[in-house]
Amino acid sequence: MPTDPKALAYFAAGIGAGLTIMGGAAGIGRLAAAAMEGIARQPNAAGDIRGAMILSAALIEGVTFFSLIVTILLAIK
């Protein structure tokens, strides 16, 4: 049974994109859970924790977006 290489590339890109999204979501989820725990322990540091959480979440989103771009580029090549 012959397999089209383009179809396999799209399939691999879909799997890569899915794993990327799941990894980013898991990372941001763990980040938010740790931030909420930190705020619960020290309510006075809520502003600092929130700022660090937003910055870290943005960095995770950036890496996730970059990885999605790479998977799309690999699929259309």
Regions found by a protein language model. Name each.
Residues 1-77:
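Hydrophobic, small-residue-rich transmembrane alpha-helices and their short perimembrane loops
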